Amino acid sequence: MKIFYGPKGTGKTKAIIDYANEAKATAKGHIVYITDSDKYGFELKLPIRFLNTSDFNVKSEDEFRGFIKGIVASNGDNEYVFIDGVARICNKLLSEVGSIFDTMADLEKEFGVKFVLTCSGTKEDLPDFILKYVD
């Protein structure tokens, strides 16, 4: 798992989009990019699959957990899943989404998919369950 973090407005979304576009060049599997807005969808290069959680009425932690499990289950060729704003998507504080990170860690281990996420906050603000993934 890879985490892009920093306070709001510090370029996390641009960094994760750039990373997704760079991963496309070497990825052997499919790439999925998930967020809750259409704002940056056109900045992703094809064939990266762009998913807006608002289109699927995902508004809670449990719904998002099911959403990411479904993405992994529906396509065994998914290599990367990029998530921009995991806490925002779940309508939770960052400190409250530990079970989502547990789910992603389990999916990485069991299915070999790589999760790349953005988290808003300084390094000091990040909960321990996220800090262990920070470079």
Regions found by a protein language model. Name each.
Residues M1-G70, L126-D128:
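Conserved P-loop
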Residues A23-A27, E43, A73-N75, D106-K114:
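Conserved catalytic network of the ASCE P-loop NTPase/AAA+ motor domain
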Residues S74-D77, G98-S99:
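N-terminal targeting/trafficking signals and adjacent low-complexity tails
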Residues G70, D77, A87-C90:
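Flexible phosphate-sensing "switch/lid" loops adjacent to ATP/NTP-binding sites
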